[in-house]
């Protein structure tokens, strides 16, 4: 009976949140921008929010990209006086974007690319494209669709549509045509965009060439929204990139890390490897953990090793699939390849063998939290459980300096402290002189 009552209460609370969210959306005078795509959407969201923050007041919702997150944001966030709301819409399965589109009713929708991520849920590129298109279909009358001109599945969303369309890409006919792409770490990404207003030269904080795509998408959207070209270029140059998305992590008198351990879909593994191949440092190492979203056999780990071996002085595989590399005994004996089971073992190995100035790529799906290997150079990392089950990164979690078995009590303690502080504020407000 108690369980039934709890369910009824939970349903009522959620319905109230949805009602408040819809009411807040209806009353808001902000320009709503929705961003989706198989990859790059988080960077577009963060960068576009950063650009618009130099032009007006902005609320940016990044990484928390579900309908529940959208409802919570709209129902709890005061949008009065906000000029722009930038929201990342993720697709974890079929019919997950449509509810967000219906709730958001965006003035602008951006689609970065269509790839076969979440393979189990979608199975085909056509199914992925159909899901992403739902954000375009949700545009308000007279809305703007910002589309990748180089992706046939994305550009197909331009027709049939009643909305304005702006395209970006390397295609000659793109409205925002990208040229002169260059990145070779430590040189950061630079490129040019040719558009109807002229040419905009961009200097970014990103270490890899493939970030031209999300940067171009954000720039195209900002220019279409009326942000001056000079302000766009200045804001792009000052962005603080998202943690663990090709994040540069430099240790004084120690190694340099590129942390790319938030996701590792098979379709984009080569982009991280290409970044390492272009880097102009003397010594390179690649640490590869879990690969996700691939069809076919686990020989993908073997293919990845063959590519990584041509780029790096040493390749380290870690996790439950480390044995699938196909590395020969000669490579193992020569130290070209190491097969380790846990992030802690990798951390210890790198600590013993690190060379000042070397570049180390940490690449994996988020389940292994390989970012701990780099964090251990600047923090006393005590959470070394191989797989903790948490989806957010270690920095966002904030408990990497606390042993995993103490996390629950630590979180409870923080909640109690927040409640007590709130209670004291209430008492203080009530006892102040009138």
Per-segment meaning from a language model:
Residues 29, 83, 107-108, 143, ...:
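The start of beta-strands in P-loop NTPase/AAA+ ATPase cores
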Residues 1-17, 162, 220-434:
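ATP-dependent carboxylate-amine ligase
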Residues 64, 150-151, 171, 290, ...:
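Residues in the short beta-alpha loop(s) of Rossmann-like NAD(P)-binding domains
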Residues 103-116, 203-241:
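A conserved, hydrophobic alpha-helical segment in the catalytic core
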Residues 2-149, 153-162, 376-381, 385-386, ...:
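Phosphate-binding loop of NTP-binding sites
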Residues 89-117, 155-201, 242-245:
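Extended acidic/charged loop-beta regions that coordinate divalent cations
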Residues 56-63, 168-170, 335-338:
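Conserved RecA-like helicase motor-core motifs
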Residues 144-148, 164-169, 314-320:
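Short, hydrophobic beta-strand segments that form beta-sheet elements in well-ordered domains
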């Amino acid at each position: 009976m108690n369980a039934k009552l709890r369910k009824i209460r939970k349903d009522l609370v959620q319905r109230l949140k949805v009602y408040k969210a819809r009411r807040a959306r209806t009353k808001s005078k902000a320009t709503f921008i929705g961003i989706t795509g198989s990859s790059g959407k988080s960077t577009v969201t963060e960068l576009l929010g950063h650009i618009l923050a130099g032009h007006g007041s902005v609320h940016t919702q990044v990484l928390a990209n579900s309908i529940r997150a959208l409802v919570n944001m709209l129902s709890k966030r005061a949008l009065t006086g906000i000029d722009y709301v930038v929201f990342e819409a993720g697709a974890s399965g079929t019919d997950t974007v449509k509810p967000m589109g219906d709730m958001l009713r965006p003035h602008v929708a951006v689609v970065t690319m269509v790839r076969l991520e979440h393979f189990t849920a979608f199975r085909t590129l056509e199914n992925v494209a159909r899901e992403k298109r739902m954000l375009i279909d949700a545009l308000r009358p007279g809305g703007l669709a910002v589309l990748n001109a180089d992706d046939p599945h994305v550009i197909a969303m331009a027709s049939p549509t009643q909305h304005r369309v702006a395209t970006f890409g390397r295609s000659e006919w793109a409205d925002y045509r990208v040229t002169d792409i260059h990145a070779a770490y430590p040189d950061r990404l630079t490129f040019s965009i040719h558009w109807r207003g002229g040419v905009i030269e961009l200097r970014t904080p990103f270490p890899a060439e493939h970030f031209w795509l999300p940067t171009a998408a954000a720039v195209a959207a900002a220019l279409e929204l009326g942000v001056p070209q000079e302000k766009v270029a200045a804001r792009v140059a000052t962005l603080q990139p998202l943690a663990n998305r090709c994040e540069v992590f430099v240790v004084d008198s120690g190694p340099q890390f590129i942390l790319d351990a938030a996701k590792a879909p098979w379709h984009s593994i080569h982009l991280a490897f290409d970044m390492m191949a272009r880097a102009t440092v003397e010594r390179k190492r690649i640490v590869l953990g879990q690969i996700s979203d691939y069809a076919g056999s686990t020989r993908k780990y073997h293919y990845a090793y063959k590519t990584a071996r041509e780029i790096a002085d040493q390749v380290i595989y870690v996790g439950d699939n480390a044995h699938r590399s196909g590395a020969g005994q000669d490579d193992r004996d020569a130290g070209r390849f190491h097969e380790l089971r846990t992030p802690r073992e990798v951390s210890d190995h790198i600590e013993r063998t690190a060379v000042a100035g070397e570049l180390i790529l940490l690449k994996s799906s988020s389940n292994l939290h390989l970012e701990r290997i780099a964090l251990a150079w600047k923090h006393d990392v005590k959470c070394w459980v191989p797989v903790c089950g948490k989806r957010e990164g270690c920095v966002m979690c904030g408990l990497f300096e606390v042993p995993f078995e103490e996390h629950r009590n630590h979180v409870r303690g923080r909640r109690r402290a927040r409640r007590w502080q709130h209670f004291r504020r209430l008492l203080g407000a009530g006892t102040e002189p009138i």
